[in-house]
Amino acid sequence: DDTVPGVDIIYPDPGFIIDKKEDLLGIVLTHAHEDHIGAIAHVWPKLKCKIYATPFTSVLITEKFKEKKIDITGYLKIVELNSTINLDPFKIEFVTLTHSILEPNGLRIQTPAGNVLHTGDWKCDPDPLIGGNINSERLKEIGNEGVLAMICDSTNVFSSGRAGSVSYTHLRAHETGPY
């Protein structure tokens, strides 16, 4: 980042979470992009809670902790795609989405008050370059069951129209230069 020369990583102040760590049931990751996992090896030693992630995300998380020589044996829990974990009083279902990385997930969080859908980063890409396609049938079922709230990440919320497929972008990049 050119605005902060010499700084390798910036992350929000974790003080609020650290103050409530006795109530923390775990860290649940939606996918392995750096803006979602980059601070984990810096913050986790102050929390020492379980980390839930899909296989691909788990590999990248493990490498981050190895780089910092932090042992997370017993804390990293690998979650299979389209499965559910129980963090009482919550049930958290991983729902496959599409994005520009392997194994992106939305999370249906069943709470005593109702269902919350956290999308993580996503894109409705009919022709994804990597990974499987969005589990649209499951998302419809979740919608039909009722959603109390939806928490949604969006990089291009102020852009009108539909974003192009990653496959199309990849094809255009190969047409314009030697990659």
Regions found by a protein language model. Give the residues of each.
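His/Asp/Glu-rich metal-coordinating catalytic cores
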Residues: 1-28, 33-172
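A short, hydrophobic C-terminal helix/tail in secreted or cell-surface proteins
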Residues: 173-179
